[in-house]
C-alpha cells in the first residue's frame, strides 16, 4: 500500500491510497489529471472516491471526476445536497453514505463518521459545512486508517488503528502573532479556531481520543500556509505520541503497508 499526497492545503486537497490491484481517492480538490499521474495513468484501478465536505479545496473538482470516470463518489447527504446546489445535475452522480455504516469500495472498507459533538445544547458540527465527515478506512495491506480533516476535534474515541491522517492546521501563538501583525484578520482568525485543528488540539485528540498502541505512523495534513511550522509540528507531535510523524507535502508518496516487510 502506498499513500500519494497530491495536495494538502487550502489550494486543494487530494490523496490516493494505492494497493496492489485497487486504489481509493480521498477528496476531490485537485485536478483529475494529477490523480491519474499518481497512479501511472491507470485510473481504472480506482474503486471509489470519498469526500469529507463540500468546500472547494476538498470537492471543487467533483464534476470533473464524475464526467471523466466511472468511480463512485461518496459523501454525506448534506455534502451531496450542498454540492448539487452549486452544479446542475451533479446530485444524480453522487453516492450518499451514512454516518456509522460500513461500505465496501472494492477491497477497501469505509465507515463514515459525522463530525458532530453532542452536548447539553444539542448537536453541532465541528466545521462550517453542511454535514462534514471523517472516515475510517480499512484494507488488508494497511490495516485501519483514520482520516480526519477540517475539524477542531474528533467526534469520539477511535481504536484499532494502524495509521492516522489528521489535520494540524495552525499553532495558536503563530495565529495570534499574525493577527497582531495584520497578516490575518479577525474574521479569518475566528473561523480558523472554530473550524480547523490547532497543534495543541491535534496532540490532545491523538493522545486522548485514539488508541495509539498499534499505530505505525501519523501523517499531519492540511497545514496553513501562514499559521503553521512544519518542523515544530512534527517534533511536538512525535514527542507527545512516541510515533513516526510525517508532515504532508504535495508530491509525497509514503509507504503505508501495515507490516514492515
Regions found by a protein language model. Give the residues of each.
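Conserved beta-strand hairpin/beta-sheet module of binuclear metal-dependent hydrolase folds
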Residues: 1-41, 131-150, 163
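Active-site metal-binding loops of divalent metal-dependent hydrolases
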Residues: 7-8, 28-30, 54, 78, ...
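Divalent metal-coordination and catalytic microenvironments
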Residues: 17, 27, 53, 73, ...
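Active-site metal-binding motif and surrounding structural segment of the metallo-beta-lactamase
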Residues: 31-79
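Active-site environment of divalent metal-dependent phosphoester hydrolases
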Residues: 55-59, 81-83, 153-156, 171, ...
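Glycine/small-residue-rich loop that forms an oxyanion/phosphate-binding "nest" at active or ligand-binding sites
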Residues: 60-128
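Catalytic core of the metallo-beta-lactamase
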Residues: 101-167
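Cap/insert and terminal regions of metallo-dependent hydrolase folds
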Residues: 158-250
Amino acid at each position: 500500500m502506498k499513500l500519494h499526497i497530491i495536495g494538502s492545503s487550502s489550494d486543494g486537497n487530494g490523496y490516493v491510497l494505492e494497493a496492489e490491484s485497487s486504489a481509493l481517492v480521498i477528496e476531490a480538490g485537485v485536478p483529475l489529471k494529477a490523480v491519474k499521474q499518481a497512479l501511472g495513468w491507470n485510473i481504472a484501478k480506482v474503486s471509489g472516491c470519498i469526500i469529507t465536505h463540500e468546500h472547494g479545496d476538498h470537492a471543487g473538482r467533483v464534476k470533473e471526476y464524475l464526467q471523466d470516470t466511472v468511480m463512485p463518489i461518496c459523501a454525506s447527504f448534506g455534502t451531496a445536497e450542498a454540492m448539487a446546489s452549486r452544479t446542475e445535475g451533479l446530485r444524480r452522480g453522487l453516492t450518499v453514505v451514512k454516518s456509522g455504516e460500513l461500505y465496501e469500495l472494492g477491497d477497501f472498507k469505509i465507515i463514515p463518521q459525522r463530525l458532530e459533538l453532542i452536548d447539553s445544547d444539542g448537536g453541532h458540527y465541528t466545521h462550517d459545512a453542511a454535514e462534514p465527515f471523517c472516515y475510517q478506512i480499512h484494507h488488508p495491506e494497511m490495516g485501519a486508517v483514520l482520516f480526519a480533516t477540517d475539524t477542531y476535534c474528533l467526534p469520539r474515541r477511535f481504536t484499532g488503528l494502524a495509521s492516522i491522517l489528521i489535520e494540524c492546521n495552525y499553532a495558536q501563538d503563530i495565529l495570534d502573532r499574525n493577527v497582531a501583525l495584520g497578516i490575518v484578520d479577525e474574521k479569518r482568525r475566528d473561523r480558523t479556531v472554530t473550524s480547523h485543528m490547532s497543534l495543541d488540539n491535534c496532540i490532545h485528540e491523538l493522545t486522548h481520543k485514539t488508541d495509539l498502541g498499534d499505530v505505525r505512523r501519523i501523517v499531519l495534513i492540511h497545514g496553513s500556509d501562514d499559521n503553521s511550522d512544519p518542523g515544530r509540528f512534527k517534533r511536538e507531535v512525535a514527542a507527545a505520541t512516541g510515533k513516526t510523524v510525517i508532515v504532508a507535502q504535495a508530491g509525497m508518496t509514503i509507504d503505508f503497508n501495515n507490516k514492515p516487510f
